[in-house]
Each structure stands twice: as C-alpha cells, then as structure tokens.
C-alpha cells in the first residue's frame, strides 16, 4: 500500500486550532476523532472505540509522520505501541502536562505522570505550547522537546473600518468603553472576578464570550448586572468585529502554566489586555500586557480606568504591543522552521 506523502495530524477531540494551523503549515491531513466527547461515565467505551478508529485510520493512511495531541494521553500511548507495526515517526503535541494539572488527585496524577514519561521518551519528538511545559517534558526524559507558541497575525482591517452593530444583533446598553473577555470554560478562569469588577463601573460594558455548555451555568449563577452581556459563542465574523471595537480586554485566570489563546488574539488587534501577574505571561508578552497583583474589583477597576482614561498609558501600550508583536513574529518564524524540520524532513 502506498504511504501518504504529508504528515497525519490526529486529536481525540472535536477541534484543535493548533492542529489546524500546523496542518496548513506543513501540508498535512488533520483528523478529529470525536465519540461521546465529555461523557465521563462513557470514558472506557469512548477510548476503546477511538483506539479502533485510530488504528483503522493508520491502516488506511499509512503515514510517514504522525502528530498526535495530548491530552488525551491514551492517543499518543496507543501510537507509541503501534509505531513498530506501522513504521511512522511520532511527534506528540503536549497541549499540557496533565499530571501537573491533576495534583489534587494524587493517584490519578501519578498514574498520568508514568504514562506521560513513557510516551515522551518513546516519541521521536515532543512539542508544547510554552517553555514551562517544555521544561517539564525534558524533566520527564522527553526526546527532542521543543516549544511551538500560539501566534495570531495582525489583521489587515483596522478598528476604524468596523461598526459595533456588526457584532451585536441586539440593542446595547449605553456605554463609553467596551471591555471583552473570551473564555474556554476552565474552572480556574476568573469570570466571577471580571463581572464583579465591572458591576460598579459606570460607562463600561463587558462582553463575555464562550460556549454556553461551558459557561452558561456560571453566568446564570452570577445574575450579572445590566452592563455585562453574555451572547454565548460568537461565530468568526461577529467575534472579529467585536475585537475590532474593543477598548480593553480582560484575561484573568489562575490556570497553571497556561497562556490563554485569547491573549494572542487581543494583542494582534492591538487591544490593551489586563492579566493577573504571572511570570510565564511576562516572559512572552513583557510590556505588552497590563499586569495586576490581585483580582479585587477595585484593582481591576483601577487598571481599566488607567488604560481608558490616560492617553500616555495607551500610547505607551500601543508601542509596547507593536514591539512585542515584532519580537514574537521573529520567534514564530524560527519555530515554524523547527516544526517543518520535524514534520516534513
């Protein structure tokens, strides 16, 4: 059987923006395998069916190189075991080192750590989305561990070319400043603190976006004030228009070793972004972000008013954002070269 020429990129998930981006860069085929996703009680059946579909895919595609996303750890584990039979090079995209995110469940954490180390040592290469995770992989004995950061190119349409009505299909409360916050639904994303900060601020409108199945129950419990809007998940066109009209963004989270994808989006649009003080974020974005020490409403409110009402602060942020973008663009180009070397050469 003839082998496919391009790499095969696989995730046991409904979608992965990283895999789509990488697939486009290297001319690979991206496959998302999704059965009973999010149904914890059905996990054993789910993983068994996914394993069978993955083996069937390998037999059909006969790839020379496979990029597999972790988590779920069972996908790269299966591929490590299948490698000798199907004769492909395996690169694992570690979206996170999950054993460190499950430390509150020590037995689960230890079990995952054993599997992570086994996979990382036997894969031909290992990539992660930030340097902290890359160091953790190397500490586990990972082969050829490297970092591939998220990167969002600057848009070609400027803020002034878009009207706010294009993203909002309903009348908006009167406001002077539009604040946005996109969330994926992780429990350590600080939605409640963001809403509390806006609750007492006149003239500010906060728009929180994200899937209703992930955020809806939390938003309902908060009974948000009239200057907080939750439209759910916006399609690409409406979300892009929202970003073009935003004055400030909030990205408050205490999730371990995580760089929210939304920060890359905000900074690509030149939106001043407020984050909780974090060495990892500072190492990547430096002066392009606004760091705060805590998430008390008065602290967040002071940062918002300083950005929106002090032109000197805004101008300096604008310069910092552009300089940081140029630095990250150079780094991105270098990382793309490494990625192509690993997946195509």
Language-model region placement:
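Nucleotide-sugar-dependent
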Residues: 186-189, 237, 241, 249-268, ...
């Amino acid at each position: 059987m003839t082998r496919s020429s391009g790499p095969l990129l696989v995730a046991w998930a409904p979608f992965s923006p990283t895999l789509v981006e990488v697939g486009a860069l290297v001319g690979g085929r991206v496959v998302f395998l999704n059965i009973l996703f999010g149904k914890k009680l059905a996990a054993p059946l789910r993983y068994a069916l996914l394993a069978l579909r993955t083996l069937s895919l390998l037999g059909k595609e006969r790839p020379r190189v496979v990029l597999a996303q972790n988590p779920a750890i069972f996908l790269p584990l299966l591929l490590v075991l299948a490698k000798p039979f199907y004769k492909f090079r395996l690169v694992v995209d570690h979206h996170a080192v999950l054993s460190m995110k499950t430390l509150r469940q020590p037995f689960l954490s230890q079990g995952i750590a054993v599997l992570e180390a086994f996979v990382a040592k036997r894969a031909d290469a290992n990539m992660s989305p930030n340097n902290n995770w890359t160091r953790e992989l190397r500490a586990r004995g990972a082969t050829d561990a490297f970092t591939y950061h998220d990167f969002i190119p600057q848009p070609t349409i400027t803020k002034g070319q878009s009207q706010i009505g294009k993203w909002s299909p309903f009348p908006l409360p009167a406001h002077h400043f539009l604040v946005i916050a996109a969330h994926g639904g992780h429990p350590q994303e600080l939605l409640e603190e963001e809403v509390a900060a806006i609750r007492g601020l006149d003239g500010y409108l906060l728009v929180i976006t994200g899937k209703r199945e992930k955020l809806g129950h939390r938003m309902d419990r908060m009974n948000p004030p009239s200057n907080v809007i939750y439209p759910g998940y916006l399609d690409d066109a409406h979300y892009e228009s929202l970003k073009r009209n935003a004055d400030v963004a909030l990205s408050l989270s205490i999730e371990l070793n995580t760089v929210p994808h939304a920060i890359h989006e905000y900074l690509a649009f030149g939106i001043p972004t407020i984050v909780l003080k974090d060495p990892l974020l500072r190492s990547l974005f430096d002066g392009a972000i606004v760091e705060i020490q805590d998430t008390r409403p008065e602290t967040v409110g002071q940062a918002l008013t300083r950005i929106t009402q002090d032109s000197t602060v805004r101008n300096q942020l604008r310069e910092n954002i552009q300089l940081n973008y140029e630095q990250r663009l150079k780094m991105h180009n270098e990382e793309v070269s490494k990625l192509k070397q690993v997946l195509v050469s």
